[in-house]
């Protein structure tokens, strides 16, 4: 029997550190205003959102710190800036809600993942509150206990 072809993942980049550094209160999907060379690079998977965050200027949201590396075959007449700020495409209600929570509650907005939705590049942003060191340690303990518990359950099932 022939193997089934693997379905390519829609995920382009993940920010795993964000869930370790912050409590994620809310997640919102936003579009990105991209240039042509950036879309080509995203298709090749050359993106990093590890240090990216969202700021607000003139009533609009912008993604800072996201790196999209240009391809080697990119056009020479266009100057490609890998770390340029990119406008987020959100509706006014979402913008007002995020802006209010960031200014009033002292929260921040971080990029969680970058992915394809149909032919459009989307970024999942999270409304986040910073964790203290003891919170991070608590999360690590909980994760380790969960893994140990799963291992015990697996071995208990084999014993009979």
Curated annotation (Swiss-Prot):
The keyword Cell membrane does not apply. Transmembrane segments: none annotated. GO terms for molecular function: RNA binding. It is found in: Cytoplasm. InterPro entries: SmpB, SsrA-bd_prot, SsrA-bd_prot_CS. One of its GO terms (cellular component) is cytosol. Its main location: cytoplasm. One of its GO terms (biological process) is trans-translation. Keywords: Cytoplasm, RNA-binding. Required for rescue of stalled ribosomes mediated by trans-translation. Binds to transfer-messenger RNA (tmRNA), required for stable association of tmRNA with ribosomes. tmRNA and SmpB together mimic tRNA shape, replacing the anticodon stem-loop with SmpB. tmRNA is encoded by the ssrA gene; the 2 termini fold to resemble tRNA(Ala) and it encodes a 'tag peptide', a short internal open reading frame. During trans-translation Ala-aminoacylated tmRNA acts like a tRNA, entering the A-site of stalled ribosomes, displacing the stalled mRNA. NCBIfam families: PRK05422.1, smpB. HAMAP family: SmpB. Belongs to the SmpB family. This is SsrA-binding protein.
């Amino acid at each position: 029997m022939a193997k089934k072809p693997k379905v390519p993942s829609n995920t382009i980049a993940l920010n795993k550190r964000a869930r370790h550094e912050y409590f994620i209160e809310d997640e919102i999907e936003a579009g990105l205003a991209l240039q042509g060379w950036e879309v080509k690079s995203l298709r090749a998977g050359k993106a990093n959102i590890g240090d990216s965050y969202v700021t607000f200027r003139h009533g609009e949201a912008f993604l800072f710190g996201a790196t999209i590396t240009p391809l080697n075959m990119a056009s020479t007449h266009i100057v490609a800036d890998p770390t340029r700020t990119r406008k987020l495409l959100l509706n006014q209600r979402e913008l007002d809600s995020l802006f209010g929570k960031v200014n009033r509650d002292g929260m921040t907005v971080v990029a969680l993942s970058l992915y394809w939705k149909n032919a459009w590049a989307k970024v999942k942003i999270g409304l986040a509150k910073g964790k203290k060191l003891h919170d991070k340690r608590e999360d690590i303990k909980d994760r380790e206990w969960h893994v140990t518990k799963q291992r015990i359950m697996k071995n208990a099932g084999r014993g009979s």
